[in-house]
Amino acid sequence: MSFNHKTIEELHDLLVAKEISATELTQKTLEDIKSREEAVGSFITVSEEAALKQAAAIDAKGIDADNLMSGIPLAVKDNISTKGILTTAASKMLYNYEPIFDATSVANAYAKDMIVIGKTNMDEFAMGGSTETSYFKKTKNAWDHTKVPGGSSGGSATAVASGQVRLSLGSDTGGSIRQPAAFNGVVGLKPTYGTVSRYGLIAFGSSLDQIGPFAPTVKENAQLLNVIASSDVKDATSAPVRIADYTSKIGRDIKGMKIALPKEYLGEGIDPEIKETVLAAAKQFEALGATVEEVSLPHSKYGVAVYYIIASSEASSNLQRFDGIRYGFRADDAKNLDEIYVNTRSQGFGDEVKRRIMLGTFSLSSGYYDAYFKKAGQVRTLIIEDFDKVFADYDLILGPTTPTVAFGLDTLNHDPVAMYLADLLTIPVNLAGLPGISIPAGFVDGLPVGLQLIGPKYAEETIYQAAAAFEAVTDYHKQQPIIFGGDK
């Protein structure tokens, strides 16, 4: 018997009633992972021994009836540090790296007696939109194994969508939670910048990175955010604001809520059928009592260009620490210190990572800093101001998560610009530090379509309220791929 169709609350009730033990749930989860792994390739590392040991310890002390997450398995993206469990960032550079500390988000999960079941595949150092730049493997879409799962958190999304796990953690720098959530038909949230500590997250773009949850439903997503969100003295960018319960508005109606629909989000480059899906969702929100009106975010069209200058510049700085001296891969054909640096980085980094390091180094160079990095920062401010103007009059922004449904494996990985444009609709949210969620909203050609809801800073409760209201009157979240036991 598999438990992957049961919600976290249902699993908790079974654990409290002792109808199953944490060990049995962990064993069943490991079986679900193994039985589906060859088809989708969600995991880099499955921490079977450590997970079973932790489950046995939880059983020995007993399930805490007041702790919803006690004994619940959790998959963690492989750029989030886990003490004693390989954390590779899907790179040859860190193929053998075993951290000596836990990321704060993982420590928070352990504090609630969650069980880390394994580390999920991703684009190398979170740089990519298809999980094809991983050094280890290519993850496949849960709905169609000839399609990409999205990225960079493709493994975390596919693990949930395929029924390997119920909950997982990802990171989002320019859409890396929301895009794979959309491609796989699950719920993925990028919290407000600073809501979840970045301590222990292998840095890509420090002003953009944020850890967030994946789950099959809106409520379960909020329940996991309750666990991982916290202020943290170990992260200088950690926010002091802390909402007591992100599920508190779930179940409330949305009558009177004002929702903005940017015309730029339904313009050039957006698949016509995705546009139709979003407009149908807008009508659904109106039927629920909300007001949906067209607005403009005029500077959003510059988001991709701004993002790739800023993110690449920050990456070129952050990745200087990987030099073959302290930890990780070290080239064995070097004859002096200079060759250690050059050979290690040449052999240890993949093509996409090297491309972004070079772009970032160029943007930060003395002759081009003002023209590129400084100018990108100025346009970033204009993008933020656009959002501020909209949120002065509206509660949320509505739009598609992605311009298309999942594309084919090996179709865009040799066309960086086309790959970058896949994040056209998610990038502005990171540039502004806002919360954004992707929820299932329909299907095009048998593939899931994601609907994105964006809020002002610290408006996760309102986002969850609206997302749950939409979920309650639709059944897209209930439809599952064949690998999960569905009929699609």
Swiss-Prot record:
GO biological process: translation
EC number(s) reported in the record: 6.3.5.7
Presence of keyword Ligase: yes
An annotated GO cellular component: glutamyl-tRNA(Gln) amidotransferase complex
Catalytic activity line of the entry: L-glutamyl-tRNA(Gln) + L-glutamine + ATP + H2O = L-glutaminyl-tRNA(Gln) + L-glutamate + ADP + phosphate + H(+)
Superkingdom, taxonomy of origin: Bacteria
ATP-binding recorded as keyword: yes
NCBIfam families named in the record: gatA
Matching HAMAP family: GatA
Name assigned to this protein: Glutamyl-tRNA(Gln) amidotransferase subunit A
Organism: Streptococcus pyogenes serotype M28 (strain MGAS6180)
High-level lineage: Bacteria, Bacillati, Bacillota, Bacilli, Lactobacillales
